[in-house]
Amino acid sequence: DGRYIALHLRYEKDMLSFTGCTYGLTEAESDELRIMRENTNHWKVKKINSTEQRVGGLCPLTPKEVGVFLQALGYPASTVIYVAAGEVYGQESHLSELISRFPNVVFKEMLATKKELGAFSRHASQTAALDYIISVESDIFIPSYSGNMARAVEGHRRFLGHRKTIDPDRKGLVQLFDKLESGQLTEGPSFSQLVRKMHKNRQGAPRRRRGPLPGIRGRARFRTEETFYENPYPECICRTTKGGTS
């Protein structure tokens, strides 16, 4: 019927290396990411505790975790998912854990010919722009990590009428995923209820932009404030009255 979810799946090699997130990876893959981080001069932090990163909600969701998350929210296996991302790390092995739950996973390379994509292939920013446009126009947008593009897409969708954007509570989800892994929880109605309750107020409904934390001064004040391009309400969104004026 043309409806689809746009999934901003931040599971590229450089993202995992930069954040130090190695959960679910093999030892060889983890070593490869560590070496990449150590050899990238402009990345200042070299030693990262992957477990602490994940527990703190600072890691992108894995393809498997995204699949579990979407099923818990009640999306059927027939759901079309457009993956807005660069090359997924360990594509076949890791993506299979998402595709096994949602077979209708598509990429821009599957929707356009090589000739059509050729005009953009040498410019990463232009291929990212394609993902951006498709994400803005999707029925539902879900980012697996809160990077700059995800924030910009969310803000754009708010500006266009607060289109549905589901913002995963990564810190909360990790606790639930770990309970699944340890056998304390099982996938099913009870698990779904926990996930849905956790995300009841994280679906792009209108809300005022969050200001800086109280007591914070100087430049740090701006770092604690929700960015304008992530949520332009109320400064840049008109509010209409019953009479039609704004």
Predicted regions span which residues?
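N-terminal targeting/anchoring "stem" of glycan-biosynthesis enzymes
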Residues: 1-246
